[in-house]
């Protein structure tokens, strides 16, 4: 394999200046998703986007299955009687609920699920008898519905979240449930690592935790315009739901005890983050393991007399790669030029492109172009399979490396309000000294003009031995670093 030339990759100027406009352009032109459906916050997955989504879903399923989770499917309808049982939960979600306003004569009040804790608990109560039935680990990938009042954005803020993976686990003790919380964090790290996403892990402040949770841990990523996007959440629910639904088990000592529960969710926001993080002014680059098409072949011939020879060689290349499991496509359209095809497949994020022309056939080689860097390589047919596998691995590693470098460059510690404001304006995520007091935290948000992501869980969150003051409440000693950002 010989590097023919280094190329100048696309810039990210459009993403930095108007990310949402760029994202709409990508979804439309790459034929991933259609935003023209006439219901606010509800959109259509197109075939190419659906193939990408299925690959992500399969990744999620594989990792959950490997860690002892079992897939289920619950109804979309939840009786309001169930939904209203947990007081914090209903306060957190009631304004976002879609009601079933007409369903025949009479009948109970129903809602479309915004999340499934209150649907699952009544059934879990029937399934669990004693300690031998625990732990129970369930998950489903379904649509959930939330009547968003804020501006909706494709994949990012929706009324129908159509790829909502929610896991629900039930445990005998708090210790076992919190062990599951730690495992859930590791599960999400594995998923996001395979999506080549960089992430912060933050313990949400009390005023922003999941309704009904004792605490919430969130995964946030930083997008090119400096705003953060929440891509996954993990909730320790304690006995808040099992108490109101009377989910108990017979312990080994013969007494009945309340079970402890967790839940954790991920949605198509993760796909949005992947498309945007690896995006540029020419389109996006898909991680090779998840790309619907990993390699595209573009035949290049001049005149009808060259076509049979070129296509015969192309077919040989195609079979060679297909037979080792590589997802490959031949773009043999006659009404498009090779240059047009190059831009088209770069837009759609195909990781590798193979060009085959008459001179390549004479040398028994092909030209392979990486989407992430646009570098071109001459590869002999004899080394093609190994070279393609190697290049896909290199592309994946580079996407991951670039994402983490960008995230680390955008994280800054500051000790003054004005410095925090300036850093936020520059597209940074700031860490500021905080006492841990909720009122001071809310005031901090207002002073800086940004949202609190929470206390870092991927680094040491403590101030340590330094005598720092809470930026919003100077009379209080700071105990933690609090992350703040603008966010979607």
Curated annotation (Swiss-Prot):
Protein task: Catalyzes the attachment of proline to tRNA(Pro) in a two-step reaction: proline is first activated by ATP to form Pro-AMP and then transferred to the acceptor end of tRNA(Pro).
Family classification: Belongs to the class-II aminoacyl-tRNA synthetase family. ProS type 3 subfamily.
Name the UniProt record assigns to this protein: Proline--tRNA ligase
Class of enzymatic activity (EC top level): ligase
InterPro entries: aa-tRNA-synt_IIb (IPR002314), aa-tRNA-synth_II (IPR006195), aa-tRNA-synth_II/BPL/LPL (IPR045864), Anticodon-bd (IPR004154), Anticodon-bd_dom_sf (IPR036621), Pro-tRNA-ligase_IIa (IPR002316), Pro-tRNA-ligase_IIa_arc-type (IPR004499), Pro-tRNA_ligase_II_C (IPR016061)
Localization: Cytoplasm
NCBIfam families: proS_fam_I
Gene name of the record: proS
């Amino acid at each position: 394999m010989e590097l023919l030339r280094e190329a100048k990759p696309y810039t990210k100027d459009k993403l930095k200046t108007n990310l949402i406009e760029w994202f709409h352009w990508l979804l439309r032109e790459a034929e991933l998703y259609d935003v023209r459906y006439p219901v606010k916050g509800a959109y259509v997955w197109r075939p190419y986007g659906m193939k990408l989504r299925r690959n992500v879903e399969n990744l999620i399923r594989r990792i959950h299955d490997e860690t002892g989770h079992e897939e289920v499917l619950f109804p979309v309808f939840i009786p309001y009687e169930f939904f209203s049982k947990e007081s914090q939960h209903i306060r957190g979600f009631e304004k976002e609920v879609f009601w079933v306003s007409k369903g025949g004569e009479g009948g109970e009040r129903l809602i479309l699920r915004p999340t499934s804790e209150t649907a699952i608990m009544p059934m879990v109560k029937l399934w669990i008898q004693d300690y031998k039935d625990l732990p129970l680990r369930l998950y489903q990938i379904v649509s959930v519905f939330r009547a968003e009042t804020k501006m909706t954005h494709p994949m990012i803020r929706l009324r129908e979240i159509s790829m909502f993976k929610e896991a629900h686990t039930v445990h005998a003790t708090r210790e076992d449930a919190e062990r599951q919380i730690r495992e859930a964090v590791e599960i999400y790290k594995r998923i996001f690592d395979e999506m080549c996403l960089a992430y912060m892990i933050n313990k949400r402040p009390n005023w922003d935790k999941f309704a009904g949770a004792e605490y919430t841990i969130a995964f946030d990523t930083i997008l090119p315009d400096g705003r953060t996007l929440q891509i996954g959440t993990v909730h320790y629910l304690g006995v808040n739901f099992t108490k109101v639904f009377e989910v108990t088990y017979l312990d080994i000592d013969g007494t009945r005890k309340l079970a402890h529960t967790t839940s954790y969710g991920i949605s198509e926001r993760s796909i949005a983050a992947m498309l945007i993080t690896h995006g540029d002014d020419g389109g996006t680059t898909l991680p090779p393991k998840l790309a619907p098409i990993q390699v595209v072949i573009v035949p290049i011939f001049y005149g009808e007399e060259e076509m049979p020879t070129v296509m015969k060689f192309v077919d040989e290349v195609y079979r060679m790669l297909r037979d080792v499991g590589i997802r490959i496509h031949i773009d043999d359209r006659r009404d498009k030029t090779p240059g047009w095809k190059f831009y088209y497949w770069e837009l759609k994020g195909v990781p590798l492109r193979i060009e085959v022309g008459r001179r390549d056939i004479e040398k028994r080689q092909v030209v392979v172009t990486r989407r992430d860097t646009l570098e071109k390589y001459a590869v002999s047919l004899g080394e093609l399979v190994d070279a393609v596998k190697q290049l896909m691995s290199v592309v994946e590693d580079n996407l991951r490396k670039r994402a983490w470098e960008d995230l680390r460059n955008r994280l800054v510690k500051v000790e003054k309000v004005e410095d925090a404001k300036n850093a936020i304006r520059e597209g940074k995520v700031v860490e500021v000294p905080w006492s841990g007091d909720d009122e001071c935290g809310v005031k901090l948000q207002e002073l800086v003009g940004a949202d609190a992501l929470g206390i870092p869980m991927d680094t040491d969150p403590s101030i340590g031995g330094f005598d720092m003051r809470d930026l919003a409440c100077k009379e209080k000693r700071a105990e933690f670093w609090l992350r703040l950002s603008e966010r979607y």
